[in-house]
Design a protein with these regions (language model features):
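Functionally important transmembrane alpha-helices
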Residues: 42, 46-50, 208-269
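Small-polar-interrupted transmembrane alpha-helices in polytopic inner-membrane proteins
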Residues: 124-125, 183-199, 213-216
Length: 285
């Protein structure tokens, strides 16, 4: 993987020891991995809240109230996250991060993005198929329109990519910038952070949170081995779209107003439902 050039000065030593050499306490605090996580979450939250208010006003003025719109609204609020992180990257010291979001990384290309989407779809699709064949769940067809399908796919992609911009784009590369070349530290820290931001999910359990942390580390491995944040975006979106829009299964413990298939809850025992919710919360927003 090609590490983003942040024009930082090399010092003697290795790893964390090299980072601390010759730095003041404020430089250490505000250049730390913890600060990257805090700043990332603040930007993430502000962007989502502001966009939610804007979309609520627009939707109310236009009289939007359909199931498709109410489902898309939940995902489209994450477009504000895109805006906040791109504005942050316009600051001179953060401009190298634009490479992680755009085409600056070798693997940030359309083929890698499409591969990620396909892999995410197949991974979740196979698990859902096995659950159906085993009799754990039963799905029934509800409705379909090509317009809703495309609109909601774009909406889900915006949400999934927003989380990847924060975790595998901003935080991952800020940690690499802090601890020069410490890829394992970057993967572990942003993976743990990825799990912690889902701790308020409906029905979240310790096992589910640990599972999400592992998933965050897996996404970091994609960024490392394929030099592609876009592939992680695609895989995340493919999984979430398959789960919540195609199959109508809980995402973050929530079932959305619109989905192509629906879960027949009458055929699912409480034990199976809880197990399925935990298993499928790993990629939830």
């Amino acid at each position: 993987m090609n590490e983003i050039d942040t024009n930082t000065t090399e010092t003697k030593g290795t790893g964390i020891g090299r980072y601390f050499a010759g730095k003041t306490i404020p430089q250490i605090i505000f250049g730390s991995a913890a600060w990257a996580c805090i700043l990332g979450y603040v930007l993430f939250s502000i962007g989502q809240i502001l966009m939610y208010v804007i979309l609520r006003v627009i939707g109310g003025a236009a009289g939007f109230s359909s199931d498709v719109w109410n489902t898309a609204l939940i995902y489209l609020t994450f477009f504000g996250v895109w805006i906040m992180f791109f504005l942050n990257a316009l600051l001179k010291k953060n401009r190298p991060l634009l490479k992680a979001y755009g085409t600056g990384l070798r693997g940030n290309r359309i083929p890698e993005l499409l591969i990620g989407i396909l892999v995410g779809f197949l991974m979740n699709g196979v698990l859902i198929l096995f659950a159906i064949m085993h009799g754990d769940i039963h799905l029934y067809f509800d409705r379909f329109s090509i317009g809703a399908f495309l609109f909601l796919f774009v909406s889900v992609f915006i949400q999934s990519a927003a989380e990847e911009i924060m975790c595998r784009g901003f935080i991952y590369h800020r940690i690499l910038r802090t601890y020069r070349g410490q890829y394992l530290a970057a993967a572990l820290i942003n993976g743990i952070f990825f799990g912690l931001i889902h701790i308020t999910n409906n029905g979240a359990t310790p096992i589910a949170i640990i599972d999400i942390m592992i998933c965050g580390i897996e996404y970091s491995a994609l960024v490392y081995y394929f030099d592609s944040v876009w592939m992680a975006m695609g895989m995340h979106a493919g999984w979430n779209f398959t789960q919540s829009i195609l199959a109508g299964l809980p995402n973050s413990g929530n079932v959305f107003p619109y989905s192509i298939f629906r879960l027949d809850a009458a055929t699912v025992s409480s034990t199976t439902w809880d197990s399925a919710s935990r298993a499928r919360s790993r990629q939830s927003s």
